[in-house]
């Protein structure tokens, strides 16, 4: 298990910043980004969205809803008027202190992500294979297309923030743009519409929560 900070000399090729400290030195909290962290005593499950807000739209909303009032929640949110992609720090480099500290006390983690794609699909990755199994079964039972994560989205590195918990393993969910858009009225993922969730959103959330109940049964 790795819980300390990551110090990279250079960012991942597709990223602007190498880690959180690099980002925070160039982007202003409250103006360009915010972070939310809610801890629930007695819960050892965290739903995290490290590319939330306008970075990978819909991931913050999914993480928050799935955590509900019972489980822990974290989101790093892009709030810029444009170019929020510059706030993306890849999962193996993400070391924002509140998230790292939360993860250090968790036995289970679901890390929420988005990727481009015109077909509805959820790719399931990470190192927590037991939880991944039940999430896959539960989503499929609810009618959602599911696939094993593509290699570039597999979440298999021990340095991935989803795996940096007490168990050294978590689940990484990659939701296509089409799937995330279906969570909001008129497929509109703009910031002003992301409070207007659909029945499909609620069905998806229930499937994830049901998977955790089955895991613990």
Where in this protein do the model-derived segments appear?
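N-terminal catalytic or cofactor-binding beta/alpha core of small enzyme domains
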Residues: 2-217
């Amino acid at each position: 298990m790795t819980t300390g900070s990551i110090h990279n000399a250079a960012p991942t090729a597709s990223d602007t910043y190498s880690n959180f400290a690099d980002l925070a030195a160039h982007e202003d909290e409250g103006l360009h980004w915010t972070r939310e962290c809610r801890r629930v005593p007695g819960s050892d499950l965290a739903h995290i969205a490290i590319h939330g807000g306008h970075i990978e739209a819909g991931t913050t909303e999914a993480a928050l809803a799935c955590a509900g009032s019972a489980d822990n929640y974290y989101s790093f949110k892009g709030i810029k008027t444009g170019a929020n992609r510059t706030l993306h720090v890849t999962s193996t480099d993400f070391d924002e202190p509140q998230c790292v500290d939360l993860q250090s006390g968790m036995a289970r983690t679901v890390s929420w992500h988005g990727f481009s794609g015109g077909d509805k699909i959820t790719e399931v990755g990470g190192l927590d294979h037991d939880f991944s199994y039940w999430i896959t079964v539960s989503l499929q039972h609810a009618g959602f297309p599911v696939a094993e994560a593509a290699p570039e989205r597999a979440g298999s590195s021990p340095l991935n923030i989803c795996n940096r918990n007490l168990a050294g393993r978590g689940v990484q969910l990659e939701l296509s743009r089409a799937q995330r858009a279906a969570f909001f009225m008129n497929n509109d993922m703009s910031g002003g519409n992301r409070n207007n969730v659909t029945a499909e959103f609620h069905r998806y959330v229930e499937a994830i929560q049901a998977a955790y109940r089955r895991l613990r049964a």
